């Protein structure tokens, strides 16, 4: 039968939506939460997620923002429409992007659909390399397949590492080559301090980005592919 999934990635959207009243404030809130709760050194990221996801849904007073370690943490809040910086700390400091890597993985997938290279119904095969990725994952097995729409939902809802690799291999042949493609796309978007080497964000010392670069990517995801933006509000999906 089909299995229902509800995952940790959806809290970014839910938390943003709770304090938003209009398009401008909504996207600003979404960017604020993405860039202040998720772009930390790897050891702090998961703990910060657990802490923030259970806080009361009250408006944030940015004047009182206190980060755990100002020397390590990075934060950037921008107006999602104008790009104006509202709050910044270590915005250009290099950090490991962790699962925010998947923002670029999906950007590449959305771009392939816009170009007509794939559709939501395109079926992508699962390799052994994809199947052996560490959790979180959809626990796909080598030889299985997944269509593009389920892959998008698995990445957004579950932050599925195996599915991110399936996308990478389908679009780039190998995950290594896809990392090069992602880095090239980052340069085209103006993300000059970002280097990708995998599609999932699993630990790799060479994979780095900045809060500033990820803000650029977040805006491009919204404005380059508005037809797919609704996927970011997905709170669950069923996969067989």
Question: Which role fits each region the language model picked out?
Answer:
Residues 213-240:
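Extracytoplasmic
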Residues 1-5, 160, 236-240:
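Short intrinsically disordered, low-complexity coil segments enriched in acidic
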Residues 40-41, 112, 147, 240:
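Proteins with a high burden of low-complexity, intrinsically disordered sequence enriched in S/T/G/P/A and R
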Residues 1-74:
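N-terminal secretory targeting signals
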Residues 47-212, 219-225:
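Active-site-adjacent loops and short helices of periplasmic peptidoglycan-processing enzymes
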Residues 7, 28, 42, 89, ...:
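Intrinsically disordered, low-complexity regions enriched in small/polar residues
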């Amino acid at each position: 039968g089909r299995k229902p999934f509800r995952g940790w990635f959806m809290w970014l959207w839910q938390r943003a939506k709770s304090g938003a009243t209009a398009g401008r404030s909504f996207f600003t809130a979404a960017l604020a939460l993405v860039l202040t709760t998720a772009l930390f050194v790897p050891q702090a990221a998961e703990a910060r997620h657990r802490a923030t996801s259970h806080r009361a849904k009250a408006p944030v007073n940015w004047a009182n923002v206190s980060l755990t370690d100002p020397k390590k943490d990075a934060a950037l809040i921008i107006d999602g429409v104008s790009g104006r910086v509202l709050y910044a700390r270590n915005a250009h400091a290099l950090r490991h992007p962790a699962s925010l890597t998947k923002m670029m993985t999906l950007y590449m997938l959305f771009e392939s659909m816009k170009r007509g290279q794939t559709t939501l119904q395109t079926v992508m095969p699962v390799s052994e390399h994809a199947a052996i990725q560490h959790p979180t994952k959809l626990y796909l097995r080598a030889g299985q397949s997944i269509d593009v729409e389920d892959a998008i939902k698995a990445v957004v809802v579950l932050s599925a590492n195996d599915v991110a690799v399936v996308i990478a291999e389908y679009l780039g042949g190998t995950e290594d080559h896809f990392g090069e493609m992602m880095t090239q796309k980052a340069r085209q978007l103006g993300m000059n301090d970002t280097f990708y080497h995998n599609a999932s964000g699993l630990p790799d010392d060479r994979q780095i980005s900045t809060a500033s670069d990820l803000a650029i990517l977040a805006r491009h995801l919204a404005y380059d592919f508005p037809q797919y933006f609704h996927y970011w509000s997905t709170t669950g999906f069923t996969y067989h």
